[in-house]
């Protein structure tokens, strides 16, 4: 009977996860968080930002950029950690504070959303198809893991606060994605 179950399991196709590879905090040299506040899950809102700086071209420069953002948030803003849950470059997803932790990305929404920042200035540059695909896969992954509600709502930061973020080009592309909320 055991042989039959093993043979049957080997014949069934493996379910592929939507989860993209995520560059973990240790890999980009994250400093220790000064405090962690957990969120209730599943989270109902996703808010997309851009960092407004240069776009990073290599994994090494992207890691350095993410570490610099964390340093700025902890030192200049006096936050407990990097404000974003995740950051996306043209090639990779970087873990900010990660799933089920409250960020510091948009006042009034931090306790009911996750914040995803695209590295670069998307008032000047267009997001790559790969980076948009990484966002879609990350969000689907969040649903699969139970971190995001099945009916989560997707926003650009400019819809909820007076800001240009996530930049006009990224904002236009977000409107083509599932779960987009016109508001």
Regions found by a protein language model. Name each.
Residues 1-51, 90-183:
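Basic/polar, cationic surfaces and motifs that engage anionic cell-wall
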Residues 40-76:
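Active-site acidic/histidine clusters and adjacent loop/turn architecture
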Residues 76-77, 146:
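Alpha-helix termini
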